[in-house]
A protein has these predicted regions:
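Conserved active-site/ligand-binding neighborhood in enzyme cores
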Residues: 1-394
Length: 394
């Protein structure tokens, strides 16, 4: 059984890669890795069991987590911008509200005389129109309901495509400066300054036209996660500096799969899977459970056999962290970035009619432990029949 939780930060949260903060490194606080959420929830579970010395740490690794997910003030989920969405600005548009145009990239075919080194059977991802301008920077997270509506043919809200629509935690970062303390003398070490940058999920301060404070915004952001064990509501720690978050249960509505989407996926010839969290594969971008023909059974869903036909990838991400059990850094690994989209043709379907719900927020990663840690969580999206017919005609 899966339990859904909302995590409400009480202070800016610090997540980092291990590099020093500062303008020289350009390595500020970032959205947390799945392992950070999994570790926090497993620690909370052990404490709920009365294990304050982490004697059940190995047992806790068998508990599955999914997340993190960004929860917006509208009480809905936000997901990373999908890699198959190309946003362009029409400089000649008379109506500035319609200057930004979103184009859907799809599996297709090369033009005559063109080719590539793509693996046999993998189609290129193409843009229906020939863009003459550069892609635009947009918000890094989009509302899930708006994304799914766009998949079904509805227009995407133009205001949400602007970079100013970036969720508040990424715009309102808190930077604090600290000094290193000499443990022997109890005084600061001269010249030893360092900074900590955190993501601020709290209500931002409003500033009026004169530059004075005008109260606080009503927007409150949070994180969401799923866990395979029940947890007590209360304060837990998450990320660096032991920052606190309030763990709240009873938020199942946030993670429910829309019934219309489940029905569409159940009868579709194929499905597009977009990563909500980075994915870890043994063969780089290619899932290890696929054979040389790019076919394989989806991990954890017996009877669901798929064939990969195309993928739209963001730049790979370097993943590392701290191993609490071994007290040493974890080996660095390359991950497929969140937002990347894979198109699969459905070859065989499970006999269980509820299989689309099992696909919702499931993990696509290769290793069992990586899936338990929440790496490679996906949302299924509606794909057009033409996305697959062009690639299956030979």
């Amino acid at each position: 059984m899966t339990h859904d939780y909302q995590l409400n930060p009480t202070a800016p949260l610090v997540f980092r890669s291990g590099k020093p903060f500062g303008s020289s490194s350009q390595d500020g606080s970032r959205f947390p890795w799945p392992s950070a959420i999994a570790g926090a929830l497993r620690t909370a579970w052990m404490r709920d069991q009365g294990d304050v010395n982490f004697q059940r740490a190995q047992e806790s690794l068998e508990l599955a987590a999914a997340g993190p997910f960004l929860v917006g003030p509208e009480d809905c989920l936000y997901v990373p911008k999908p890699a198959d969405a190309l946003v362009l600005r029409d400089e000649d548009a008379k109506d500035t509200t319609k200057a930004l145009q979103i184009h859907r990239m799809r599996p297709g075919k090369f033009a005559d005389g063109c080719g590539s080194t793509l693996p046999q059977g993998l189609c290129p991802v193409v843009v229906p129109t020939d863009p003459v301008v550069k892609p635009q920077n947009t918000a890094s997270f989009w509302r899930l309901d708006q994304l799914l509506a766009w998949d079904s043919g509805q227009p995407f809200p133009a205001a949400q495509l602007e970079s100013i629509a970036e969720p508040a935690p990424f715009r309102h970062r808190q930077i604090s400066t600290h000094v290193q303390i000499d443990r022997k003398s109890g005084t600061s070490k001269e010249g030893q300054l360092f900074q900590i940058e955190g993501l601020d999920f709290g209500r931002a301060r409003n500033i009026d036209s004169n530059g004075f404070s005008a109260g606080f915004s009503s927007e409150q952001w949070a994180l969401g996660a799923r866990f395979s064990a029940p947890l007590d509501d209360g304060l837990i720690h998450l990320g660096g500096e032991r920052r606190g978050v309030w763990l709240q249960s009873g938020v199942n509505h946030l993670f429910a799969m829309p019934p219309a989407l489940a029905q569409a996926v159940s009868t579709a010839p194929g499905v597009a899977l977009t990563f909500c969290t980075p994915a870890l594969f043994s063969q780089g971008w290619k899932p290890g459970w696929l054979d040389n023909a790019l076919c394989g059974e989806f991990p954890g869903i017996s009877g669901l056999r798929l064939r990969l036909i195309a993928c739209a990838l963001e730049r790979w991400q370097g993943i590392s962290g701290w191993d609490l059990a071994r007290q040493q850094p974890k080996p660095a690994r390359k991950a497929v970035a969140a937002g990347s989209t894979y198109w699969f043709e459905i070859l065989e379907r499970p006999t269980d009619a509820q299989w689309p719900q099992a696909l919702w927020l499931a993990s696509l990663s290769d290793a069992t432990q990586d899936r338990r840690d929440g790496w490679g969580t996906v949302i299924p999206r509606i794909a057009q029949d033409t996305d697959f017919s062009l690639c299956t005609q030979g």
